[in-house]
Amino acid sequence: AKGALAALDKANISHGVGKDVIVMGFDCNKWALEELKAGNWNYDGQCNPFQASYIDDIIKKLENGETISEKTIIMDEKGFDATTITQEDVDNYGI
């Protein structure tokens, strides 16, 4: 995302809350959360790679008309919005 933001900045294209381009990320590192808090991003959510294969299986089952009988959570994932994120969120959840 840093590269994308640098390209937008270089092209003088505004990004973030109320601007030309909506920016979303899925890593929740401290830098990204600080950018979110500053309004330069719109949303950032945690995305745990350990859940990817499980989620892929669920998608395939649903596409085949199957139902999911139980819910498995490997880790709770958080999502943060630029209008509600706090410094406490950055400190507690930024990696």
Question: Each PLM stretch: what is its role?
Answer:
Residues 1-34:
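Hydrophobic alpha-helical
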Residues 22, 42-43, 78:
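Conserved beta-strand segments of alpha/beta enzyme cores
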Residues 15, 43, 68-70:
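Residue-level detector of short coil/turn "hinge" positions at structural boundaries
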Residues 47-95:
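Hinge/cleft segment of the Venus flytrap/periplasmic-binding protein
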Residues 38-49:
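Short beta-strand elements at the ligand-binding edges of bilobed clamshell
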Residues 7-14, 35, 39, 58-66:
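Structured segments of extracytoplasmic/periplasmic soluble domains
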